């Protein structure tokens, strides 16, 4: 992936942030968002980041290799976490928006433009933004944010796997796999499960 999209904007803007989230669909764990700003005129091949892509298309090992490199070469980056109890209270969409806004607010310097993966965004600050469908596969800064969000969340869920070994969080990361649903049926929900996410498989409405 290249920074061609950013290059088209850099003549007039220097601080462009990509943002993306991880963890909207799981039954357990937080939703995580990341924001990344690269230096103006940054070229990925000079940093060994030309293999960057949408995090879902990358192997776990490659994501883990790329994440520290992204942090090293980014001008600014930030990650924000919204826990399951907040998700249950305000719903997953609002929690995702809050995570994205918190990530942007945590950057050491505010961006002049935000590039958002998806088709909806509700900014808290008066910063211009663009929503880009499948942006994590098209825009370098968004792809970088997707990797940081995904690796951060995976680390959280792997730790939960040690705390709650019956559930296998380190394997499915909270997503509704057959083994995860069976574990909920057998052992019930943990404190890190989202109570508002109901399971038709268990007769919940």
From Swiss-Prot:
UniProt GO molecular function: manganese ion binding; RNA binding; RNA-DNA hybrid ribonuclease activity
Designated name of the protein: Ribonuclease HII
This protein's UniProt keywords: Cytoplasm, Endonuclease, Hydrolase, Manganese, Metal-binding, Nuclease
Function: Endonuclease that specifically degrades the RNA of RNA-DNA hybrids.
PROSITE patterns in UniProt: RNASE_H_2
One Gene Ontology cellular component annotation held by this UniProt entry: ribonuclease H2 complex
Annotated GO biological process: DNA replication, removal of RNA primer; mismatch repair
Cofactor binding note: Manganese or magnesium. Binds 1 divalent metal ion per monomer in the absence of substrate. May bind a second metal ion after substrate binding.
InterPro entries: RNase_HII (IPR022898), RNase_HII/HIII (IPR001352), RNase_HII/HIII_dom (IPR024567), RNaseH-like_sf (IPR012337), RNaseH_sf (IPR036397)
Subcellular location: Cytoplasm
Record Gene3D superfamilies: Ribonuclease H-like superfamily/Ribonuclease H
Documented EC number(s): 3.1.26.4
Domain RNase H type-2 positions: 14-205
Reaction equations catalysed: Endonucleolytic cleavage to 5'-phosphomonoester
Alphabetized PANTHER family for the sequence: RIBONUCLEASE H2 SUBUNIT A, RIBONUCLEASE HII
Positions of a divalent metal cation binding: 20-21, 117
Pfam families found in the cross-reference section: RNase_HII
Cofactor(s) the protein requires to work: Mn(2+); Mg(2+)
Native organism taxonomy: Bacteria, Pseudomonadati, Chlorobiota, Chlorobiia, Chlorobiales
Family per similarity comment: Belongs to the RNase HII family.
